[in-house]
Swiss-Prot record:
Biological source species: Pseudothermotoga lettingae (strain ATCC BAA-301 / DSM 14385 / NBRC 107922 / TMO) (Thermotoga lettingae)
Keyword set, alphabetical order: Ribonucleoprotein, Ribosomal protein
Keyword Ribonucleoprotein: yes
UniProt record, GO biological process: translation
Protein name stated in the entry: Large ribosomal subunit protein uL29
């Protein structure tokens, strides 16, 4: 998910998306530990999506526009 796509969401939608991504990351970590996750690069992608969402929420909180 690109930052430009994320910026189109409202704050409430971003908070919901953040919770979904955190749950997805937790599930992926369990799958990885059990040896069921084939594409481990997905964990990295989800972590980065979470970081992007949190960054955009923080920018909005501080009133920073990009």
């Amino acid at each position: 998910m690109k930052a430009a796509e994320i910026r189109n969401y409202s704050d409430e939608e971003l908070k919901k998306l953040l919770l979904e991504k955190k749950k997805q990351l937790m599930d992926m970590r369990f799958q990885h530990a059990m040896g069921q996750l084939r594409n481990t690069a997905q964990i990295k992608e989800v972590r980065r999506d979470i970081a992007r969402i949190r960054t955009i929420l923080r920018e909005r909180e501080l009133g920073i526009r990009r």
